[in-house]
UniProtKB/Swiss-Prot annotation:
Gene, per the UniProt record: ZBED10P
Protein known as: Putative protein ZBED10P
């Protein structure tokens, strides 16, 4: 599989590196397996596994790439490796909790940027946000509108609908109390933390032969767009 990924016409490092990490884990498992077997040809098999594992570990350029943030996050977001994340992460002082926090920060960062793009700023030109209320009343037959009342733009409505959709999603998960029950909307940091936990806790994974992007495409239809953070998006 590593050879197949690396030989693809448009293979990216974010696709190949997780497979290399998985290969390293496999070689370690093979080493342990043969150590537990009876004597015979196990010596040659152990030497082969050790040699391949050592070659992966001692390649300086490869090791540097393993520790780069974007490639660690690409592995974390690959549903093929859910349940094996601790074993696949690069060796060092940083653990899974550290990378979860990095992912939460990235999700929050993207959510804030999306909200900023969809929400009108009070400093924007009135042309895009407001119209003369008297002209609106005359043209539509509506009277009595306040002189200072702005007409909301479609982008503002879109942002409101997106926020309501996200709120409903979290309430349906049981992860956020509704306002009717006395709860309030979470902060963006808490929201991002909930989404990351939801992804990591869910049981659905994909097989080694399956395309992870198909998994994320399905999630895109079920979840708000800002949740579906795949390696080809701005997160990485």
């Amino acid at each position: 599989m590593v050879v197949r990924e690396a030989s693809a016409a448009q293979a990216s490092l974010s696709q190949v590196l997780p497979q290399l990490r998985y290969l390293h884990i496999f070689l370690e498992q093979v080493h342990t397996h043969f150590q537990e077997q009876s004597v015979g040809e196990r010596g040659a098999a152990i030497q082969l596994a050790e040699g391949l594992a050592r070659q992966l570990c001692t390649d300086c350029q490869l090791n540097k790439l393993f520790y780069r943030e974007e490639f660690v996050l690409a592995t974390l977001l690959d549903p093929c490796f859910k349940g094996k994340i601790e074993a696949i992460l690069p060796w060092g002082p940083t653990d899974i909790d550290h990378w979860k926090q990095v992912l939460v920060y990235k999700v929050k960062e993207i959510r804030v940027s999306e909200y900023s793009l969809n929400s009108p700023s009070p400093l924007q030109s009135p042309r895009g946000l407001c119209v003369d209320p008297t002209r609106v009343a005359k043209s539509s037959g509506v009277e009595g509108r306040s002189q200072g009342e702005p007409l909301q733009s479609s982008s503002h409505s879109g942002a409101f609908l997106l926020a309501q959709r996200e709120k409903g999603l979290l309430e349906s998960m049981g992860l956020l109390a509704s306002e009717r029950s006395g709860g309030s909307l979470s902060t963006k940091s808490h929201w991002a933390s909930i989404i990351v936990k939801k992804y990591l806790w869910e049981n659905e994974t994909v097989g080694a032969q399956d395309d992870p992007l198909a998994y994320w495409e399905k999630k895109r239809e079920a979840w708000p767009p800002s949740i579906c953070l795949t390696p080809h998006r701005s997160l990485l």
